[in-house]
Amino acid sequence: MLDPNYVTGFVDGEGCFAITISRIRFKVAEVRLKFEIELREDDELILKEIQKVLGCGSIYRLEYERYKKWRPHVKYQVGSLRDIKEKVIPFFKKYPPQAKKKKQFELFCIVAEMMDQKKHLTKEGIEEIFSLREALKMHKDSLDARDEHVQWGVE
């Protein structure tokens, strides 16, 4: 089994604590949390080992046929809020990210707590999640280059 500190270091470089807000019927917003790591297909073994350490999630194959020079990829993803709250967050609180994923993880935890309290189901809660995004922009220097490192897709 992989050393937990190795997993955290790997995630600091390759992982993503994603928060997405999608518009669904009747202009209601839906908030989702996902923990993801995407690698080239030949690195699938490391994703399987991380999956064992965390004890949750799925691994998917991705084909990028439209990009001729791209190789197939694999993605490890945890999308279950229960697994995120009971496995992913406790793991990374015990072995916290130290580099560019630190702020992303902190924000991820705040939004997970809001979801646990059902705040994401209210207009005020959605507005608070958007304002957290703006606050994160002010911490760019503690992150990486020009990217907030949080997926904020409005679908």
Segments the model singles out, each with a brief description of its role:
Residues 1-155:
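Sequence-level preference for short, compositionally simple segments enriched
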